[in-house]
Amino acid sequence: MKRRQAELFGALGENYGALPEGFVFQPDFISSDEERALLEEIARLPLEAAKYKQYTARRRIAYFGFGYDFTANRLGAAPPAPAFLGPLRDKVAAWMSLAPAALEQALVTEYRPGTPLGWHRDAPDFGRVAGVSLGGWARMRLRRYPRGKDTPIVLELAPRSAYQMQGAARWQWQHSMLPTRMLRYSITFRTRERS
């Protein structure tokens, strides 16, 4: 337990204990063997440049279950998730106390060195969100939305760590990624938000 607390304190630095309500962070969510197997499979995926309206990002992505059309601001069709994502989806769903089928979208993202991700909240068509980090480290920032005067929280996402967002963390906070220093991948799972 003390090792886990030390890892979390190191991940948050001076912001220890400052995570928003509904944000859960877990170091070493998967093993190095699981990470290696996932990276081998991801290397075979046909990743494409991420597009946001008329902007082409430096990230490369592959959507499964549902895509998202940022020009039309709506969900789009995407192929079913490949079999290799099944065990990870099951593990994430159990951690979130959900049935695996509730995680209807999977997104694989490649961050090459120097790739950022700007401030945003995930599209409102989605509900709960979980992400698993692979490869390199990342620095995730969190800030209230609408933006207040608080200093953003910075969280170090180590390889093999995971986070989940629901409630206030999902709807009342934005997140971003600082430019990566080394090649990194993330696998994001999302539930659908049904009104």
Mark where each language-model region is:
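Non-heme Fe(II) oxygenase metal-center motifs and adjacent flexible, charged/small-residue loops
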Residues: 1-195
